[in-house]
């Protein structure tokens, strides 16, 4: 069958939500049709995977539609399989239990119905419930509640006889003490339901459970109510509840049994979650615009205000008296063991003290800080009265102390937010009112992140309330209090506009306009990031709110003061404490809702003047800036922060009833918009969205009532000399939003004059433009042009712009460097705005930002911050690429490392984008050199993913590089050799293929140079690369003959190199795509005649370069009695003109190659002279088979001489034997004797030194030996160390890439409890010290000496002493600052052996550098110096080569 089980399994496992929704119904149809799904039960494994996929991926999906579909499919499976589905119950139950706590009622209901169906058709209720007990302890309170409700439904459908209730009741009793009230209520309802089915025996059983008497009284009261109501199911009283003989412990009567277990199918299906849900689920969510009280059981601000003063009167006699009172209060509130009434009295006493003037005492505020913990505990209390009093007290503190309550408000706010979704109305409303009071009275910017973070809560109730709080905050607070969190506010409002809940969206749109009144520029930017549908919703919100029809008649007088706007949601309070709805100033002379279109064929200024005089003062477009709206339209927008003295008449309009959501239902006539292009971006920018024509323009005759100033203004005779008081309103200039300069038109001389005046009068500009919220010069200018780009973005009342210019970048950088992730995110948003404004950073700012970005690469909040960081990084690189050359190494390497991390797909794409931008922004040769350095850096241990990323990056770089960018340096040679080893990476085929592609790309990039580079490598590396290139050339030549047009995608310039290629024509032929088969080695046909001719060029080019290696790094550079010239070897070689020009970079005097810094393994001798392509000296012995046999003598001399083939015979190939030995050694902790034998055999092979063995098996052998060091058998551990030591003696050069790992494992072996192992470890460490390059060895040892404990630090110091004996004076000088701290630390160690070893190491250092050690020992005490001098003298007397003896210090 084409669409069998395997096909549907694949469909289930795919992740795309859209496809899932499409394929779900088809799958259900497939399962219901027995003819189509005949193979459903044939393959149990596939069925298991199918059910598992449905349970984990579908039912647990974040998309509720997918979850519902997943449950439908499972239901179809239950129907089809019946009792055969029983084996799958354990798979699906965890997911179904999780979904019992889902936020959507439909999901919970369907989940419960599915569980009931499983109990009926696939198993029995008891079997399912025994596997659901964990649900009573689920971390999600909704799930715990849902399990209780499911139990009630089970009892109603199947009756009590189907369950062993005595096993379930203890779990329910535990939930009676649950911290969540909804769970406690559900648990009580469960017990009541059980009582209905079982009877009085439940009452007796609960009495034995040790429950608190108060709780028992509540439960028993409910039992009595049920009994009196006549809804008991059992007719006979007192069944045997504890009897285990029956299923549920009772023997139901036939009547009750038939009533429950024989219930018809329809009746059973009728019992759904809806009937068992708590009644207040939906009402828990507040209604926007409603009062806090929300009916019976709640509280509002009036209750709070009465509670402020409804406290006993106290007197404060002294500071000490106050302090003692507060200490007693703190003691009571901090211990929830105290009686709740005592705690309530303590909370009231705080208010009493406030009324008595406690805030006037100096000791009050320190004591108040100490009460933070007590307040949190009280706000979390399970007793609602305590919570209520705590919230009233917090509100009172905020009202009395104002901003001085900043610390307490910040500390307590998160706890109070937890009350908002509480089902107990008294608790929820208390929390809401407390938060409102704090927002009104305590304007602390640190509260904003707390509010905005809760706007993303999973609870709809919390989100709705949070947007209400945000709206209140935007109305109540001054702009300067909000400036720090502009970006966070904008982001939060954007999320609210997209919220899943319609009421939250309504309030969020209201928040937007409040935000717009503070930060118009940012609001406009936010508007343009929204989709058109959301933009229209904002516009319609503005239109609907442009009316006063919903205002109460009492608030429509023209003299209504601005205070009426300052209390949204709670409304104004009359002296008697009565509340009325929120009012609005009504000064508009326009007809409500008369928004009109602008006409582009009318002069802008003329239209503006006419509009200011017309009866209709509406804005010029369907969407215009708030400044242009008639004042009366502010009824539902953010408050206007100045008091206006209104003039003119108001339009009397009959009020309309409000709907259930508290919103006005005034009729707004839908007017057609002919040719409505006003929603297009250009139109919005040009005239609608804060455009030139929005609002009254330069009309000096404008009445004072039409002016808006955002700051409190002195009236009367005030001369307003303060610069901050100079507002735009004096000149009758509106404040249009910023628009692009390209879209501004100076349409008259008036505008031109204004522009000139603006340019002349604003402060001298700095060399940069500040970002975002600081781009507002006009806030402090005496005049502003109507077309000025900044004329509407002023923030009067904030810090003047000319004082902020130097702060903006510093503040952004400080945010970016913050330890708080939200501040870092805010800083990044600010930095994005700054970069988009083309603000150029100074060198100091760049340096600091680079340091911050370097730290951000390791940001733990990857989901929250890292994604935004990557976006900012791209902009940063594009703008400042010319100044980031020094930072390129960190940038490139960190991005490549991130490619190896486990990141989300979207984040990974951003990392890749950053890499692409980096590649295109910097010189290719510089990037290539950095990558070469990164590959050979011993401190880096890239994982397989990082290796793939590096290789792919090099490949893409090689496609764009110029041939002259490829430099045959020592670093490049070592990196290429490393890449060649990666072509045989055993763990990853991706790495192997990528490495092969890179080698081919480099070969094609600069064939002569790459060929010469290969000639400098050991023969084994050459063999690996040559095989690959042979295979590639063979495949490419074949593919080019078959399809001449097939290309590899390289740019044509790559083949137009001016250098002559020593290879034959196949190198220049076009190549096909690199398929995996082309990249594999084809050893069978390697020497066949048919490809020999095409490979001759490659072979000759490699063989005709003489081979030499640099001075081997395993022997000391400092050799006594040896001259530098003796270290040279064959100076035979040939190079191209490019390498000839570079010759000087790799030469030192005497024609000897310079040692590259710590990493160079292979250097070619520079050519003596260039004599043309064939003018090279040819040495046929240089490439004999034994060229790379690592002979001890050759290693000591540190050269690969031409006659090395004469030093030993060709070794025997033990590859097959070693493979068997390794297989045996992989049996860790098993077959001890066999593995001992294998290790002994391996020891013999090690001494025979077979080249082929080590080429093929070295890495595997090393890793197995290091793993064997953890074996259970001590003899095996000791033997492994001896084998390791023998390999170190014979193959030291191979440990270069594994030095750190080998040293660490060897030192760890010193901790072994068996002396035999420790002795072997000491021998291995001693050999290791003489085998690995000294500098590399010391760099590994220094941190170990400083951080490790005894005996590892002792072994490391001893090893370091041996290394120092073979290091040169110059090299030791460079790394001495790293060495000395660890030794001085060891000199103070509690272990005498460590102290002694440290002294010996210092003596060894002194023997190398002499008196120059003295400055490093300044912190040693006199006694320690004397001891050190004693050992130095003793060493000098025993050393005949020493010429003099001197003290290190003057202390002696």
UniProtKB/Swiss-Prot annotation:
Its GO CC terms are: centrosome; Golgi apparatus; kinetochore; microtubule; spindle
Q: Where is the composition biased (Polar residues)?
A: 573-597, 715-724, 1058-1070
Matching entries from SMART domains are given as: TOG
Organism of origin: Xenopus tropicalis
Self-association and partners: Interacts (via C-terminus) with clip1/clip-170, and cenpe.
Show the segment(s) annotated as Disordered: 239-299, 545-735, 771-792, 1033-1076
Instruction: Name the family the entry cites.
Output: Belongs to the CLASP family.
Instruction: Give the source's domain of life in one word.
Output: Eukaryota
State where composition is biased (Low complexity).
253-267, 550-569, 606-621, 645-659, 668-682, 781-792, 1034-1046
> What is the name attached to this protein's record?
CLIP-associating protein 1
Its chief place of residence is cytoplasm
What span is annotated as the signal peptide, if there is one? none
* UniProt cross-references to Pfam families, sorted A to Z: CLASP_N
An example GO biological process term is: regulation of supramolecular fiber organization
Sorted alphabetically, which keywords does the UniProt record give? Cell cycle, Cell division, Centromere, Chromosome, Cytoplasm, Cytoskeleton, Golgi apparatus, Kinetochore, Microtubule, Mitosis, Repeat
Subcellular localization(s) per the UniProt record: Cytoplasm, Cytoskeleton; Cytoplasm, Cytoskeleton, Microtubule organizing center, Centrosome; Chromosome, Centromere, Kinetochore; Cytoplasm, Cytoskeleton, Spindle
Where do the HEAT repeats start and stop?
68-87, 88-124, 163-200, 407-442, 443-479, 926-963, 1256-1293, 1374-1411
Show the taxonomic lineage: Eukaryota, Metazoa, Chordata, Craniata, Vertebrata
Per the entry, what this protein does is: Microtubule plus-end tracking protein that promotes the stabilization of dynamic microtubules during anaphase. Plays a crucial role in chromatin-induced microtubule formation. May also act at microtubule minus ends. May be involved in the nucleation of noncentrosomal microtubules originating from the trans-Golgi network (TGN).
């Amino acid at each position: 069958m084409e669409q069998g089980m395997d096909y549907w399994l694949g469909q289930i496992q795919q992740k795309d939500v859209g496809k899932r929704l499409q394929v779900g119904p088809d799958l259900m149809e497939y399962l219901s049709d027995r003819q189509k799904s005949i193979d459903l039960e044939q393959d149990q494994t596939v069925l298991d995977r199918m059910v598992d996929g449905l349970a984990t991926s579908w039912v647990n999906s974040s998309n509720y539609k997918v979850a519902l579909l997943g449950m439908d499919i499972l239901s179809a499976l239950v129907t089809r399989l019946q009792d055969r589905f029983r084996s799958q119950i354990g798979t699906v139950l965890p997911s179904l239990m999780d979904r019992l706590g889902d936020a959507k009622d439909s999901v919970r209901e369907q989940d419960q119905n599915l569980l009931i169906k499983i109990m009926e058709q696939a198993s029995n209720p008891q079997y399912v419930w025994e596997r659901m007990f964990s649900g009573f302890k689920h971390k999600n309170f909704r799930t715990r509640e849902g399990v209780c409700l499911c139990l009630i439904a089970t009892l109603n459908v199947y009756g009590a006889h189907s369950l062993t209730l005595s096993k379930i009741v203890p779990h329910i009793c535990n939930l009676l003490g649950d911290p969540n009230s909804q769970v406690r209520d559900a648990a009580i309802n469960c017990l009541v339901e059980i009582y209905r089915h079982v009877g009085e025996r439940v009452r007796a059983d609960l009495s034995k459970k040790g429950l608190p008497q108060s709780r028992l009284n509540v439960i028993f009261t409910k039992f009595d109510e049920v009994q009196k109501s006549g809804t008991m199911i059992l007719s006979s009283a007192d069944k045997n509840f504890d009897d285990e003989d029956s299923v549920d412990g009772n023997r139901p009567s036939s009547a009750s049994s038939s009533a429950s277990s024989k219930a018809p199918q329809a009746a059973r299906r009728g019992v759904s979650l809806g009937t068992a849900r708590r009644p207040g689920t939906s009402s828990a969510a507040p209604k926007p615009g409603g009062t806090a009280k929300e009916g019976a059981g709640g509280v509002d601000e009036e209750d709070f205000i009465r509670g402020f003063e409804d406290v006993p009167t106290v007197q404060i006699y002294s500071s000490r008296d106050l302090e003692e009172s507060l200490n007693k209060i703190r003691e009571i509130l901090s211990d929830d063991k105290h009686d709740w009434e005592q705690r309530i009295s303590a909370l009231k006493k705080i208010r009493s003290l406030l009324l008595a003037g406690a805030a006037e005492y100096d000791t009050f505020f320190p004591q108040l800080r100490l009460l933070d913990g007590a307040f949190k505990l009280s706000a979390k209390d399970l007793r609602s009265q305590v919570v209520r009093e705590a919230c009233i007290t917090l509100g009172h503190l905020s009202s009395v102390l104002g901003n001085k309550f900043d610390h307490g408000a910040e500390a307590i706010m998160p706890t109070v937010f937890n009350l908002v979704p509480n089902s107990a109305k008294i608790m929820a409303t208390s929390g809401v009112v407390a938060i409102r009071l704090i927002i009104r009275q305590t304007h602390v910017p640190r509260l904003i992140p707390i509010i905005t973070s809760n706007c993303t809560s999973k609870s709809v109730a919390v989100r709705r309330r949070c947007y209400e709080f945000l709206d209140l905050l935007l109305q109540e607070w001054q702009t300067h209090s909000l400036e720090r969190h502009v970006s966070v506010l904008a982001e939060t409002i954007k999320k609210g506009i997209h919220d899943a809940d319609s009421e939250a969206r309504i309030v969020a749109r209201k928040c937007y306009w409040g935000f717009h009144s503070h930060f118009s520029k940012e609001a406009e930017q936010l508007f343009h990031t929204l989709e058109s549908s959301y933009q229209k919703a904002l516009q319609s919100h503005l239109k609907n709110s442009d009316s006063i029809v919903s205002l109460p008649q009492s608030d429509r007088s023209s003299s209504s003061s601005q205070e009426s706007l300052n209390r949204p949601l709670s409304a104004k309070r009359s002296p008697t404490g009565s509340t009325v709805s929120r009012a609005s100033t009504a000064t508009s002379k326009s007809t409500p809702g008369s928004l009109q279109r602008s006409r582009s064929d009318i002069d802008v200024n003329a239209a503006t003047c006419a509009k200011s005089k017309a009866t209709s003062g509406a804005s010029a477009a369907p969407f215009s800036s708030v400044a242009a709206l008639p004042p009366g339209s502010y009824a539902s927008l953010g408050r206007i922060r100045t008091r206006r003295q209104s003039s003119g008449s108001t339009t009397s309009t009959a009020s309309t009833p409000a709907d259930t959501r508290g919103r006005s239902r005034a009729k707004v006539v839908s007017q057609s918009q002919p040719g409505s292009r006003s929603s297009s971006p250009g139109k919005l920018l040009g005239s609608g969205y804060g455009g030139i024509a929005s609002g009254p323009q330069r009309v000096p005759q404008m009445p004072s009532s039409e002016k808006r100033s955002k700051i409190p203004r002195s009236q009367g005779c005030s001369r307003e000399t303060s610069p901050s008081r100079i507002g735009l309103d004096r000149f009758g200039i509106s404040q249009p939003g910023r628009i692009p300069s390209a879209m501004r038109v100076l349409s008259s001389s008036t505008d031109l004059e204004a522009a000139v005046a603006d340019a002349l009068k604003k402060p001298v500009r700095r060399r940069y433009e500040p970002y975002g919220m600081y781009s507002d010069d006009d806030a402090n200018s005496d005049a502003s042009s109507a077309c000025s780009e900044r004329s509407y973005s002023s923030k009067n009342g904030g810090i003047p712009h000319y004082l902020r210019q130097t702060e903006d970048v510093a503040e952004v950088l400080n945010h970016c460097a913050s330890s708080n992730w939200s501040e870092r995110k805010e800083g990044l948003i600010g930095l994005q705005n700054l970069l988009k404004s083309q603000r150029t950073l100074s060198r100091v700012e760049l340096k600091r930002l680079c340091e911050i970005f370097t730290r951000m690469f390791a940001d733990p909040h990857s989901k929250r911050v890292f994604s935004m960081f990557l976006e900012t990084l791209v902009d940063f690189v594009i703008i400042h690429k010319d100044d980031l050359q020094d930072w390129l190494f960190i940038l490139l390497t960190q991005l490549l490392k991130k490619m190896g991390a486990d990141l989300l797909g979207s984040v990974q794409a951003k990392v890749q984008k950053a890499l692409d931008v980096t590649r295109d922004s910097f010189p290719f040769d510089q990037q290539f050199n950095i990558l070469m350095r990164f590959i050979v850096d011993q401190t880096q241990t890239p994982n397989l993913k990082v290796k793939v990323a590096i290789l792919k990056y090099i490949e893409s770089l090689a496609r764009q590089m110029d041939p002259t960018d490829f430099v045959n340096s020592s670093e490049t040679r070592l990196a290429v050799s490393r890449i060649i080893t990666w072509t045989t990476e055993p763990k990853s085929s991706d790495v192997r293929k990528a490495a092969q592609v890179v080698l081919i790309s480099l070969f094609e990039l600069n064939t002569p140079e790459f060929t010469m580079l290969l000639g400098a490598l050991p023969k084994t590396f050459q063999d690996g690369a040559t095989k690959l290139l042979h295979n590639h050339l063979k495949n490419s030549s074949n593919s080019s003959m078959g399809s001449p047009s097939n290309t590899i995608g390289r740019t044509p310039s790559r083949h137009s190199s001016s250098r002559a290629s020593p290879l034959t024509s196949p190198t220049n032929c076009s190549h096909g795509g690199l398929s995996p088969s082309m990249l594999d080695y084809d050893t069978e046909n390697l020497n066949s005649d048919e490809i020999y001719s095409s490979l001759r060029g490659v072979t000759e080019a490699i063989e005709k370069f003489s081979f030499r290696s640099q001075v081997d790094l395993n022997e000391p550079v400092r050799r006594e009695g040896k001259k530098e010239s003796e270290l040279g070897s064959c100076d035979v070689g040939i190079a191209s003109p490019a390498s000839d020009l570079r010759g000087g970079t790799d030469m030192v005097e005497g024609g000897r190659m310079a040692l590259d810094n710590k990493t160079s393994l292979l250097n070619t001798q520079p050519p003596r002279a260039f004599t043309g392509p064939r003018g090279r000296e040819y040495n046929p012995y240089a490439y004999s088979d034994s060229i790379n046999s690592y002979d001890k003598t050759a290693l000591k001399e540190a050269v690969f001489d031409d006659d090395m083939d004469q030093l030993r015979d060709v070794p025997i190939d033990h590859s097959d034997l070693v493979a068997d030995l390794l297989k045996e050694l992989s049996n860790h902790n098993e077959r001890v004797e066999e593995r001992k034998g294998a290790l002994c055999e391996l020891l013999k092979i090690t001494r025979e030194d077979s080249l082929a063995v080590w080429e093929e098996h070295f890495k595997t052998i090393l890793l197995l030996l290091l793993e064997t060091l953890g074996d259970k058998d001590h003899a095996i551990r000791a033997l492994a160390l001896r084998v390791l030591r023998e390999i170190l003696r014979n193959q030291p050069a191979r440990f270069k890439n594994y030095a750190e790992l080998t040293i660490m494992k060897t030192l760890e072996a010193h901790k072994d409890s068996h002396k035999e192992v420790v002795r072997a470890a000491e021998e291995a460490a001693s050999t290791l010290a003489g085998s690995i390059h000294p500098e590399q060895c010391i760099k590994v040892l220094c941190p170990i000496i400083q951080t490790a404990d005894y005996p590892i630090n002792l072994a490391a110091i001893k090893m370091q002493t041996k290394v120092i004996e073979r290091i040169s004076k110059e090299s030791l000088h460079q790394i001495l600052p790293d060495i000395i701290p660890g030794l001085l630390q060891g000199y103070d160690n509690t272990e005498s052996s460590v102290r002694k070893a440290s002294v010996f190491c210092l003596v060894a250092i002194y023997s190398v550098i002499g008196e120059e050690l003295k400055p490093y020992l300044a912190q040693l005490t006199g006694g320690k110096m004397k001891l050190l001098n004693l050992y130095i003298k003793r060493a000098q007397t025993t050393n005949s080569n020493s010429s003099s003896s001197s003290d290190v210090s003057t202390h002696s």
